[in-house]
Structure formats: C-alpha cells, structure tokens
C-alpha cells in the first residue's frame, strides 16, 4: 500500500525521535514501519538501537509481524517496556525483579478484601478508579489526604495505603505502577 504525501514526509523526517499522532485506521503503523526500515536501510541506523513503542498489545503485535525478521532493540507497549526495565533495575528502587503484574480482576479482588474490613458502601471499582487517578497524578498514599478533601477522601486514603502495602507484600505491581 502506498504512502500519501504526509505519511511519506513523516517517514523521511529523521532529525530526532518521532511520535505519530493520528486517528484509528489512518496508517500510523504503516508509517512507523516504513520509517524504521528507512532509518535502517538508508541512514544505517543499527536495528538493535531502534525502539518501537505503542499503547496497545494489538498494535505491538502488528508491528512485530510487519517487521518480520528485522531484529529491533524493542517492539512493544509502554507497559511492556517499563516492566522490562523494572525487571532489570527495579531493585534500585525497591522493586523485586520477580514481581507479578496485577490486572484489573486481581486489583478488584485485593480491594474487596481490604474494604470488607472497613465496612464501606463504596464499590471496589470506585476505589480502583480513585487509586488509579492518584497514581496517574503521582500522588502517594501518604499524601492523598493532603490533596483531596472530599467526603470520601479519608476512606480512599485508608484503602489506598493498605492496597499499596498488600501489593508490596505480594511482590506485585499494577499497570499504573509500571508507568
């Protein structure tokens, strides 16, 4: 499939790192593949020095498939790259290299166990949402109450602290921890 003018310009722009922002089905993966192949073939960039990072496993799988036998430094999601880095150097920041990654069902099960003890009417998903939002803003459990003062902040802070303690005890990280 041919590249349009804008896509070809993106492929040929080689002045530094690239980010391709476009809607679904617009050819982002095709542009990235052509760009990487162009860098390797024409600019003599060593293939093992190329990182191709995306948001979804589906896109990462597609990039790997389309690259074929070309061996790159890394092709995968942001989460996968972070997990790889933490498995190599996580001990430098107190993370066991053999950590497990909790998905949403693991997280909800953990939260359900915590909230059984405190008798709250809030759902496990409510706590998961609030904890995820806090992590996205880099708010640690000990600082939660200093920042949030709504009617549920105290109980969320309590659950968040216990949640983090249990993750650490279980040598686990959630997807928010990876980023």
Predicted segments — roles?
Residues 8-11, 29, 40-43:
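Short, flexible, glycine/charge-rich loop motifs used to bind or transfer phosphoryl groups or to couple energy/partner
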Residues 15-16, 37-179:
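A basic/glycine-biased coupling hinge at the interface between accessory DNA-binding modules
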Residues 1-15, 175-178:
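N-terminal pre-P-loop "Q-motif" helix
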Residues 7, 25, 56:
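A sequence-level detector for short glycine-anchored, His/Arg-bearing signature motifs
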Residues 15-34:
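Walker A/P-loop
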Residues 1-2, 23, 115-119:
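Short amphipathic alpha-helical boundary/capping segments
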């Amino acid at each position: 499939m041919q590249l349009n003018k804008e896509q070809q310009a993106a492929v040929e722009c080689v002045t530094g790192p690239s980010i391709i922002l476009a809607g679904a089905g617009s050819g982002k993966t095709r542009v990235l593949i052509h760009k990487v192949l162009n860098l390797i073939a024409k600019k003599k960039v060593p293939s093992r020095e190329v990182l191709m990072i995306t948001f979804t496993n589906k896109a990462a799988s597609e990039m790997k498939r389309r690259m074929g036998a070309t061996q790159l430094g890394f092709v995968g999601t942001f989460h996968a790259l972070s997990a790889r880095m933490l498995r190599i150097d996580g001990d430098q920041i107190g993370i066991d290299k053999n950590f497990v990654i909790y998905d949403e069902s693991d997280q909800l099960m953990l939260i359900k166990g915590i909230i059984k003890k405190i008798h709250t009417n809030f759902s496990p998903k409510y706590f998961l949402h609030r904890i995820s939002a806090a992590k996205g803003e880099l708010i640690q459990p000990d600082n939660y109450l200093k920042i949030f003062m709504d009617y549920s902040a105290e109980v969320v802070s309590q659950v968040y602290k216990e949640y983090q303690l249990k993750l650490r005890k279980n040598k686990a990280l959630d997807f928010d921890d990876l980023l």
